[in-house]
A protein has these predicted regions:
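Acidic/glycine-enriched connector segments
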Residues: 2-126, 134, 144-156
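Divalent-metal-activated hydrolytic enzyme cores
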Residues: 157-164
Length: 164
């Protein structure tokens, strides 16, 4: 298992859940954010080790998080829209591997985590970008992504300890 870092854009919802899961497990995390560190709930707290992009907004941040990672896990609930759709489109444009995890199709976080793990292993992902709707676009997104990514990270760490 090769995962060594989680990145995201720091927005509320799925992005922040991925960072929360990494921080809770002491896995390195980071990513690019707009220069003003703004998210829909205000300034992104400093506990998230994110790099501000001076004079840049959400689109540039999303592009760099896609291009600077080995692959992207997109967790969503209904349809791809807004920044979540942009992430998928940038993955395709930049020929970066990605996996779409629909909570509507895979409501069990353990099953979703298994799919993400298979993607990480199959694509040789060391730096994983995690993206999805902000909190206002999916009320349950943070909780779902926190469970999924928490399980992904726990499994990776357990396997690295046991050498499998």
């Amino acid at each position: 298992m090769t995962l060594r870092k989680i990145v995201s854009g720091g927005q509320t919802g799925v992005d922040r859940a991925a960072l929360d899961a990494a921080l809770a497990a002491n896995l390195p995390c980071g990513g690019w954010v707009p220069g003003d560190r703004m998210a829909e709930d205000g300034i992104i707290p400093e506990r998230y080790p994110l790099i501000p992009l001076p004079n840049c907004g959400y689109r540039q941040r999303t592009r760099l998080n896609v291009s600077d990672s080995d692959g992207t896990a997109i967790l969503y609930n209904e349809t791809l829209k807004g920044g979540t759709r942009l992430t998928r489109n940038l993955c395709a444009l930049l020929n970066r591997p990605y996996i779409l995890i629909s909570a509507r199709e895979i409501p069990d976080p353990n099953v979703a985590a298994a799919a993400v793990l298979k993607f990480i292993e199959g694509s040789g992902i060391q730096v994983l970008n995690v993206s999805g709707p902000r909190a206002s676009g999916w009320a349950g997104g943070h909780a779902f992504a926190l469970q999924v990514m928490g399980q992904v990270i726990a499994t990776v760490q357990e396997r690295s300890v046991h050498g499998s």
